[in-house]
A protein has these predicted regions:
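NTP/phosphate- and nucleic-acid-binding module
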Residues: 1-372
Length: 372
């Protein structure tokens, strides 16, 4: 209602809460061709920031476009000199990226999950701070289908961490026993986070965990055990809407507002309570409700303008009426002052231009100020 009153048509989208955590996150976006956010939309009404957008997992297909078929063949190691990327693998094996399991090692900061029972989890130091137990530094390997990209905002939410980034150099070798380009799911020293896109893959290709080699005939349900399975893919145009299954389309937008619930996460941590009507202590709930004033003003100007300047809508204009006398003297001054007083008495916000300037200057300034 606030943005409607300001004359702006916004789109409410599902969004990520960021490091603060919480739930029920929604951003209020305004469509803009130069927007810095990508919105994934469906005709059924589903709307989400690409950082949060979910989609229905599609069926992995083979080179002919048919569903991949399970194999009983054992994993086979193949020498792959100078094959480092998914594109290199496509050329070398003569198949599509949908048959590859991409493995990426991530450095994770302040992971809030219990990794003690995960593969390699005991190698990471766990710290307790009050009621919060976490790992200041840990690593995970993300497995995702070769034609897809990892959504790091989703991954951070799944791991309950404050930050993460792709590991580099010696970190990768320490966790995967192989350099980047040859990381695989079967020789890891860290937990596996498997995207839903990998669950139904069959007879797949992957890194071997040994430099210069890859493996084929990989069956995810047979050959390794992930620590967690979840949605960590970046949704794309054409992906199936999670609500109705129809394809996504996208728009660019700018965030004007953001709301989300924090619950009792912080009030519990700070031991904050109040007494209810019966005198019993209750932990209060928190929420975040923000409007970007500068962004909102910029969006109003972008929406309401002409070739001479701003055309503010009535609800946001600095003044609703400009009284611009051509010559502020004698009878014209009396008439201007009377008009100003009458409008002010009626509750109209009025600007009286009483400057000793040429009419053209006054009218030009009125256009620049943006009177309705």
């Amino acid at each position: 209602r606030i943005f409607k009153r300001l004359g702006l048509k916004t789109i409410s989208v599902k969004a990520d809460t960021g490091n603060m955590g919480g739930s029920g996150s929604e951003e209020f976006m305004i469509e803009s061709p130069v927007g810095d956010d990508t919105l994934m939309l469906c005709e059924c009404g589903y709307a989400a920031n690409v950082e949060k957008a979910a989609c229905r997992p599609d069926v992995p297909t083979d080179d002919s476009g048919n569903p991949q078929v399970k194999t009983d063949l054992p994993v086979e190691e193949v020498a792959t000199p100078n094959v480092f990327s998914i594109e290199d693998m496509e050329k070398f094996f003569g198949t599509t990226s949908k048959r590859f399991i991409k493995a990426l090692i991530y450095r994770v900061i302040n992971c809030g999950l219990d990794l003690s029972k995960a593969n390699g989890g005991k190698n990471f130091k766990q710290v307790k701070d009050g009621n919060f137990t976490y790992y200041p530094l840990s690593y995970v390997c993300v497995l995702i289908r070769g034609d897809l990209e990892v959504n790091e905002a989703k991954l951070a939410g799944l791991l309950k961490c404050s930050d993460l980034c792709l590991a580099e150099g010696d970190e990768i070798i320490q966790m995967a026993n192989a350099p980047h380009g040859f990381v695989g799911p079967m020789t890891l020293n860290c937990p596996i986070i498997q995207d839903l896109s990998v669950v139904d893959m069959h007879d797949a290709f992957a890194g071997s965990g040994k430099e210069g080699f890859h493996i084929k005939h990989v069956e995810p349900s047979r050959d390794y055990t992930p620590f967690m399975v979840g949605d960590v893919r970046t949704a794309m145009v054409g992906d199936a809407c999670p609500d109705c299954g129809k394809p996504f389309y996208s728009k660019k937008g700018n965030e004007l507002g953001h709301i989300f619930k924090l619950g009792d996460k912080y009030t519990k941590a700070m031991n904050v309570t109040y007494l209810d009507q019966s005198g019993k202590p209750v932990v209060p709930l928190m929420g975040c409700y923000g409007i970007g004033v500068d962004r909102t003003l910029a969006s109003i100007i972008e929406t309401y303008h002409d070739d001479k300047g701003i055309m503010f809508p009535m609800s946001t204009a600095p003044y609703q009426v400009a009284v611009v006398p051509i010559n502020y003297k004698d009878k014209m001054k009396e008439a201007s002052d009377q008009l100003y007083e009458e409008l002010t008495t009626l509750g109209v916000e009025v600007l009286l231009d009483d400057r000793n300037e040429r009419p053209g200057v006054k009218f030009n300034d009125a256009d620049l100020i943006g009177f309705p």
